[in-house]
């Protein structure tokens, strides 16, 4: 989904809260009781069931009995551009790879978000014209017709109806088909459906991940009845979470064979590879496209001079565009008679060049001027960071929603192409449950966007300060923990899904090192490629990859809203030993990291086993987080560098651990007038670290 400003999401109500914070900071330390540090990872019933079944385990890798549903779609759809109506037929072959028989089938009907009874999240935009939702007019399972009349409500004393035909019951954005005979484990079934819906018009704002501008441009997504995920985690198997328009999706992987019938003269961008270019593109357009992979230049393939049937496309009334996508979790498309087409390439390490296409309105050429280079850099950089881009093409399409991702296609303005391209890794390649755990795709993506931006600028990633900034909001009563269902995260959904994960990963870098974090996440990405990792798989995988027991870390960051709130309480010197009393008033522990700044001249600085000399007069000294596991809130750090004068000591000098008041991290304390100055902020809205 669209890139969100970390500044807007992290610096919330700081000025309004200042008086209360000042009182809290002035309170006696005795107000904070000794703390018991929780060091295990809480396990819910669903993950315990998966462990017991052997589908997942504490290695963090897919278990020996891991399985997932597989869905193959064959879809034919027609767009009535004047009416804005899409009519379709689908045939879905579903492979049940589980040990469980299916007594029901659950379908996703996400277009009902726009229907009269759609339950929409509070932050869903109101620029959308409501429709009648999706109208399913025919449905069969293995050739047996499904009765589309909702079943009568049960009345006490009335015997249940005999299951002569499968029954169909719609609950807003999902439908349950109750089967008269269970579908066998390790078997397959075929579902066929006919449906139609009106694409919602968008005026004066943005769409909810799709929409139409007038009757000349359509972004089409969440547009076909989709078989819901059936996995090893839920009791009963099926994902029945409602689509509310804020949190996103959870999809099966499978194969898509899709034919789209649109007016001649309209260009189509879609998930997958176009199978019939000779039938839908004019010879001159195909000839220009034949040079796409020859260089990094952006080629102008279709210009306004090519608008209309018989120019960019063959003449006639209508054309059918045929796309095929292997191993994808969804299919989306966009079409317009006003699109121009630019083309370039990205060179993927180990794979070679892949085509990158951009379909946009001529009036938006300034916004799209850098779309090609941005998308190229994103695909190449993230391929090296995590793993090679998994798909054969990427298409960016203009339209009412300027920041939404689908496999191989992005509804995006040029400025968001780096962020949206990152989603081709999560969740398009690692199929996480975005509806529940938005941080596993949006949050990870925000983190990698920080790295990508720095790479484009030939700078070091500005991760210092990111982790520390969480202390400014931690404990807010409106903040849901990251493990809380993102569908119901409330007013701080954006913070929970987008902002907190990069803070967490910055903090983890402060514990184990940024390069170690990125190496472990690359290994995690390879292990779960085209599978469905859960948060527990991620946590256990990272523990094993980093050779650390990080239960204390995961608990504080994911299951709670804790902060470190560390400080230097006292410094005293006797002989050649300086004792620094460090205090942590928050519930989250951290390693004790001190930057010790010496006078430029004086007696020799003696080495310490847990210290590294940064330069001739600065040492970085670290004690592991274990020093807090006994429950104390204070730790006496012994500095045994000899008799060289120490001029300054800073706790958490790289600003990685959540802290509300950073001024008490420094000894001696900053001057009062300096402390009153507002903190500088970097590009991502984070305080500039001055450690």
Annotated model-derived regions:
Residues 29-34, 85, 95, 101, ...:
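A surface-exposed beta-strand-loop module
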Residues 93-131, 244-248, 253-263, 536, ...:
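Surface-exposed beta-strand/loop patches in extracellular or lumenal glycoproteins
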Residues 102-158, 263-266, 597-610, 622:
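Solvent-exposed beta-hairpin/edge-strand motifs
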Residues 227-238, 244-418, 446-447:
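Hydrophobic helix-coil surface modules that form long, contiguous segments used
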Residues 27-108, 504:
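Early extracytoplasmic/domain-onset interaction patches
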Residues 117-130, 196-256, 277, 655-691:
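Glycine/proline-rich low-complexity spacer/linker segments in large multi-domain proteins
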Residues 269-270, 282, 334, 571-653:
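Beta-strand-rich binding/interaction modules
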Residues 24, 38-51, 55, 70, ...:
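Hydrophobic alpha-helical and helix-loop surface patches within well-folded domains
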């Amino acid at each position: 989904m669209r890139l969100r400003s970390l500044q807007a999401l992290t610096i919330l109500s700081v000025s309004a809260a200042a008086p209360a914070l000042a009182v809290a900071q002035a309170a006696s330390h005795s107000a904070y009781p000794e703390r018991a540090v929780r060091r295990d990872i809480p396990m819910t019933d669903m993950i315990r069931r998966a462990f017991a079944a052997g589908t997942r385990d504490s290695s963090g890798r897919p278990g020996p009995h891991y399985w997932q549903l597989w869905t193959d779609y064959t879809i034919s759809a027609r767009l009535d551009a004047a009416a804005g109506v899409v009519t379709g037929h689908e045939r879905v072959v579903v492979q049940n790879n589980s040990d469980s028989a299916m007594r029901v089938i659950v379908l996703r009907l996400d277009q009902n978000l726009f229907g009269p009874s759609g339950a929409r999240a509070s932050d869903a935009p109101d620029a959308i014209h409501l429709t009648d939702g999706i109208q399913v007019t025919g449905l069969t399972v293995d050739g047996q017709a499904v009765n589309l009349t909702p079943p009568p409500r049960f009345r006490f004393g009335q015997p249940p109806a005999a299951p002569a035909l499968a029954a169909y019951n719609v609950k807003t954005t999902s439908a349950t088909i109750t089967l008269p005979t269970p579908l066998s484990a390790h078997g397959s079934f075929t579902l066929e459906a006919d449906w139609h819906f009106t694409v919602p018009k968008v005026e004066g704002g943005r769409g909810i991940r799709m929409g139409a501008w007038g009757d000349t441009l359509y972004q089409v997504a969440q547009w076909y009845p989709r078989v819901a995920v059936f996995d090893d985690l839920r009791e009963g198997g099926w994902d029945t979470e409602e689509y509310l328009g804020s949190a996103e999706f959870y999809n099966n992987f499978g194969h898509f064979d899709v034919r789209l019938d649109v007016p001649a003269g309209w260009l189509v961008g879609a998930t997958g590879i176009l199978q019939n270019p000779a039938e839908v593109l004019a010879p001159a357009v195909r000839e220009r496209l034949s040079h796409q992979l020859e260089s990094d230049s952006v080629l102008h393939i279709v210009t306004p001079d090519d608008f209309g049937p018989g120019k960019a496309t063959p003449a006639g009334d209508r054309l059918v565009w045929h796309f095929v996508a292997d191993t994808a979790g969804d299919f989306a498309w966009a079409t317009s008679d006003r699109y121009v087409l630019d083309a370039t390439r990205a060179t993927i390490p180990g794979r070679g060049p892949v085509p990158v296409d951009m379909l946009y309105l001529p009036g938006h050429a300034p916004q799209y001027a850098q779309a090609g280079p941005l998308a190229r850099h994103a695909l190449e950089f993230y391929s090296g960071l995590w793993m090679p881009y998994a798909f054969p093409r990427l298409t960016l399409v203009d339209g009412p929603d300027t920041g939404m991702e689908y496999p191989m296609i992005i509804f995006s303005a040029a400025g968001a192409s780096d962020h949206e391209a990152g989603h081709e890794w999560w969740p398009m390649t690692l199929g996480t449950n975005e509806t529940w755990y938005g941080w596993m795709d949006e949050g990870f993506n925000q983190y990698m966007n920080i790295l990508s931006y720095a790479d484009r600028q030939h700078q070091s990633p500005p991760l210092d300060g990111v982790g520390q900034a969480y202390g400014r909001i931690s404990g807010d009563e409106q903040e849901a923990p990251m493990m809380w269902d993102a569908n119901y995260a409330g007013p701080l959904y954006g913070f929970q899904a987008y902002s907190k994960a990069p803070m967490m990963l910055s903090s983890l870098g402060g514990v184990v090192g940024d390069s170690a974090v990125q190496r472990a996440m690359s290994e995690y990405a390879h292990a779960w490629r085209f599978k469905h990792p859960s948060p527990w798989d991620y946590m256990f995988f990272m523990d094993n990859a980093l050779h650390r027991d990080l239960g204390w870390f995961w608990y504080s960051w994911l299951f709670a809203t804790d902060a470190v709130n560390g400080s230097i309480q006292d410094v005293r010197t006797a002989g050649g030993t300086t004792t620094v009393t460090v205090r942590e008033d928050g519930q989250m522990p951290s390693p004790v990291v001190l930057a010790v700044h010496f006078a430029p001249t004086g007696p020799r600085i003696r080495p310490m086993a847990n210290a590294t000399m940064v330069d001739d007069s600065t040492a970085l000294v670290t004690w592991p987080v274990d020093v807090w596991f006994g429950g104390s809130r204070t730790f006496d750090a012994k500095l045994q560098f000899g008799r060289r004068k120490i001029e300054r000591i800073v706790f958490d000098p790289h600003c990685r651990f959540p802290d509300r008041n950073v001024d008490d991290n420094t000894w001696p304390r900053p001057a009062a007038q300096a402390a009153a100055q507002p903190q500088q902020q970097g590009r991502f809205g984070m305080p500039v670290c001055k450690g």
